[in-house]
Amino acid sequence: ALWQFNGMIKCKIPSSEPLLDFNNYGCYCGLGGSGTPVDDLDRCCQTHDNCYKQAKKLDSCKVLVDNPYTNSYSYSCSNKQITCSSENNACEAFICNCDRNAAICFSEVPYNNEHKNLDKKYC
């Protein structure tokens, strides 16, 4: 779920305010996304969007009325390491790994302030 993704990003980047920092960044960070990613961070978001699209195609996710933004899962954070719980079902595990990989990606690439609230005409 979105609030868990927020927590994962805080785990990897404790100084961040994920919903403020990463929402409406570039062409893909935030709801929706199209065009060409503007940088590596935007590519992290594009990959995350594609991961959620794959999750929605899984049979184990089809029974859910929810979508990946609201479907919750179990994970833990210790010493900046994110672990998805083995108790997650197949769908939860998939979404957890989408979020985990994106949080790791965010922590490994530069943040360019000029790409925050980017006019989508540049996408």
From Swiss-Prot:
Keywords: Autocatalytic cleavage, Calcium, Disulfide bond, Hydrolase, Lipid metabolism, Metal-binding, Phospholipid metabolism, Secreted, Zymogen. GO terms for molecular function: bile acid binding; calcium ion binding; calcium-dependent phospholipase A2 activity; phospholipid binding; signaling receptor binding. Coiled coil: none annotated. The active site is at 48, 99. It holds the Pfam family Phospholip_A2_1. Gene3D superfamilies: Phospholipase A2 domain. One of its GO terms (biological process) is fatty acid biosynthetic process. Activated by trypsin cleavage in the duodenum. Can also be activated by thrombin or autocatalytically. Its EC number is 3.1.1.4. Monomer or homodimer. Secretory calcium-dependent phospholipase A2 that primarily targets dietary phospholipids in the intestinal tract. Hydrolyzes the ester bond of the fatty acyl group attached at sn-2 position of phospholipids (phospholipase A2 activity) with preference for phosphatidylethanolamines and phosphatidylglycerols over phosphatidylcholines. May play a role in the biosynthesis of N-acyl ethanolamines that regulate energy metabolism and inflammation in the intestinal tract. Belongs to the phospholipase A2 family. This is Phospholipase A2. It comes from Ovis aries. The lineage of its organism: Eukaryota, Metazoa, Chordata, Craniata, Vertebrata.
